[in-house]
Amino acid sequence: MAARTDSFDLAKLNLSSGEGRRLTLAVALDPFEFAGTEYAVDPARIDVTLDISRMTHDGYALRLRFAAALVGPCMRCLEDAAPSIDVDAREVDQAGGGEELSSPYVQGGELDLAQWARDAYALTLPNQVVCRADCAGLCPVCGANLNDDPGHAHERAPDPRWAKLRELRLE
């Protein structure tokens, strides 16, 4: 069972230069709003693998890995969708290393694990949440699910610009 945490004190590991540790921690991820619709993360409290390595100069190399499903309606057909999303994020935090080597998730030796996990998950979200890659969506005329009836079709509506010609009777 993973320890529950939203932040983690890196100094309490007492790592010497070049030493590393792998930890499994539980982090809560709040639901996401995506294109105006709320999507839940399943499970809401996920086990993450955190690799921490102490760099030779005062700093840390961090790696965060986990997988979780994004649960909500398919953006094409509105059926349930739950694509699994794998996250593999890396950060470096080195004192005096400038902006490039300073992680926004490490403040005073404290790693904001919940915010890093949320941001890393958000960066790996797909452009569209779909139930399956070949989802056909809904019929634009009647709203029928085209996955259930792939041969679904409607008679083409006549062009209204030619309506008066239909009234013309040639005998």
Residue ranges and their predicted role:
Residues 1-171:
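Structured interface patches
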